[in-house]
């Protein structure tokens, strides 16, 4: 499963990435973005996640 994490607090994003990697090793973090602009650019470039975590 491809996961996108959208979070402006770096520590929270890193904690989620670590937790997902530990509990669900089959999950692939395809991107971690910090803003709407960065996220929109990622999608415009062809990004296609299965699941999105936002503002956790």
Predicted regions and their residues:
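Non-catalytic signal-transmission and effector/linker regions of two-component phosphorelay proteins
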Residues: 1-4
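Charged phosphotransfer/docking patches of two-component systems
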Residues: 10-14
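Acidic, metal-coordinating helix/loop segments flanking the phosphotransfer/catalytic sites
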Residues: 17, 32-51
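Alpha-helical interaction/dimerization surfaces of two-component signaling modules
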Residues: 19-23
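Conserved acidic carboxylate
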Residues: 7
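Active-site residues of response regulator receiver
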Residues: 55
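A generic structural motif
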Residues: 24-30
């Amino acid at each position: 499963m491809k996961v996108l994490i959208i979070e402006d607090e770096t520590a929270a994003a890193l904690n989620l990435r670590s937790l997902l990697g530990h509990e669900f090793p089959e999950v692939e973090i395809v991107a971690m973005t910090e803003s709407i602009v960065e996220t929109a650019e990622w999608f415009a470039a062809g990004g296609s996640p299965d699941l999105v975590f936002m503002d956790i």
